[in-house]
Amino acid sequence: SRGLGDVYKRQVYENGKYWLFGGKKGCDQEELYLWCSDDNIWGNYYPKEGVCVKKGLRGSRMAGDFFRVNGQLYRPSQDCLEHYGAGTVIWCVDSVSLDRYEETEVAVLYPQPRSNYPDGLHTINFSDNWCVIDGLHIKPDFWRGGLLRLDKKFGLGFFD
């Protein structure tokens, strides 16, 4: 996976191949790309540019590792329509190949307004009998807001 210039990569083995999902630097996490390897998890992934399989602020940014329930593959993603990591969307992966990627939305998770993390749920991972969720609490900060506006205007990369 080295040299692909991608960010937030997630790998999964499906249909006899290793699949690498991720964004590309400079795409502002609004696009999800797919690469494939026939060898192994550290193999030569192709195509070098990747195949764009999803566009938009809702569902393009990964929100954790793929997981399986009763053999079915699922992909967690972030809902960034309102802001980074406002919620988590779970997709059932229906088909994965370089020619065709299809998924169906099956669940959406948003934080409770009065919780300790009312502003987002941006990561979910499963392991054995464990589920780990990373919540978001945005504290008002004059300097951060100013930097965010400058970063967006001039593409400084502070929040990449």
Kindly label every feature range from the protein language model.
Residues 60-67, 73-77, 81-107:
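Accessory, usually C-terminal, subdomains that scaffold auxiliary metal cofactors
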Residues 27-36, 82-94, 141-144:
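Structural motif
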